[in-house]
Amino acid sequence: MDLILLIGIATALLIILLTLYFLQKRNAPAETKAAAQPQRGVPLRAQEGVPRRAQIARNQRNRLRANQNAPDAVAPVAAAPAAAIDPDGDEDGDENGPRVPQGAVLDEKMGAKKRAKMEAKEQKRLQREQELHDREQRKVKEAKEEAERKQQDDLDAEVERKRVEAERVVKELHERKEHEMYLKMKATFSVEEEGFEEDDADDKEADFIQYIKDNKVVLLEDLATTFKLKTQQAIERIQELQAEDTITGVIDDRGKFIYVSEAELAAVAKFIKQRGRVSIADLAESSNNLINLTPVTASEGGA
């Protein structure tokens, strides 16, 4: 009795399994066809059951490992939060938005358009970093050149300052030497000028005396004009010469000086000695014969 019951149960289970097998086999072609044709409007990863966030995190980890092996690689940026990425897969944004990590391994199943966009964005980022690096290098180079230029300018300024100082010293020495020579020459000229002045004074005095002797009767105003003197200066000069016994004569009340030579004075003295006592009238009458009042030039012309 128990054996028959067990056989019946086993048979029922076998029938159920066969039924399920045939039903599953019948539905398999439809599922395969549906899997071969992706649904429109649904992301490929969603259809394949691959989580997008997990794929991005895995790519970032791959990129970090790649940067650790590259000595010149730029320091990796922190992984962007998954919430910052558009759930629909649109990663377009400004430059401050999420960036594709350098060296990230792109999913082979990613669309060609999105792959190209991400590669272009990565290339742009690398180019920007290179530009920043070049700019920093250029700034360093310019700063170095500016420091060298300033140092050279300081050296040139110091050389110029020393040159100007040397020229100033040489100029001062030259001027001092010239001044000393000038003082020596001036002293020499002063001595010579004093000698010339004395000679000129002697010559002028001789001319003054000779003029009086030649003219015999001299109008004092004419004498002063001839020798560029004032009348009073001419009178004083005559008085000085008379005091020195250089010339002899008298100044009358008409402003004339009458010159009397030594020979004429001797003749007058002889006349008075011969006559004994002589009146002024007799002396005046005889003076025309004793004293020659004719100018020397006129007497020479008459001869």
Curated annotation (Swiss-Prot):
Coiled-coil region(s): none
Ranges annotated as spanning the membrane: 3-23
InterPro entries per record: DDRGK_dom-contain, DDRGK_domain-containing, WH-like_DNA-bd_sf, WH_DNA-bd_sf
The entry's keywords: Endoplasmic reticulum, Membrane, Transmembrane, Transmembrane helix, Ubl conjugation pathway
Gene Ontology MF term list: ubiquitin-like protein ligase binding
Cytoplasmic topological domain: 24-303
Comp. bias (Basic and acidic residues): 106-160
Subunit field text: Interacts with Atg9; the interaction is transient.
Descriptive protein name: DDRGK domain-containing protein 1
Organism of this sequence: Drosophila grimshawi
